Amino acid sequence: MKFLFLFLAILLAMEPVVSGRRHMLRCMGDLGICRPACRQSEEPYLYCRNYQPCCLPFYVRIDISGKEGKNDWSRENRWPKVS
């Protein structure tokens, strides 16, 4: 019984082991991921600090003009309209 408590104390005192996968570098306000090549469902947009493309999901829209216009993605044309 003492051996069991000793084993549990040692097990709880050890730091958790992280798998060998590298930490993913996030970009565009945590909407994208920096990768060497984007997946089929992602679009490359600009570049990250490590000179890899920032891969955004296809449904993310980026307005590079900085102002909202009268296009399909403007505030007035969004669905659903809240009154």
Curated annotation (Swiss-Prot):
Keywords: Antibiotic, Antimicrobial, Defensin, Disulfide bond, Secreted, Signal
Broad class of where this protein is predominantly found: secreted
GO cellular component entries: extracellular region
Disulfide bonds: 27-54, 34-48, 38-55
Residues annotated as signal peptide: 1-20
Localisation per UniProt entry: Secreted
GO BP terms in the entry: defense response to Gram-negative bacterium; defense response to Gram-positive bacterium
Alphabetical list of InterPro entries matching this protein: Defensin_big_dom
Protein family according to the UniProt entry: Belongs to the beta-defensin family.
Stated role: Has antibacterial activity.
PANTHER family cross-referenced by the UniProt entry: BETA-DEFENSIN 119 (PTHR47902:SF1)
Protein's name in the database: Beta-defensin 119
Source organism of this protein record: Bos taurus (Bovine)
Name of the encoding gene: DEFB119
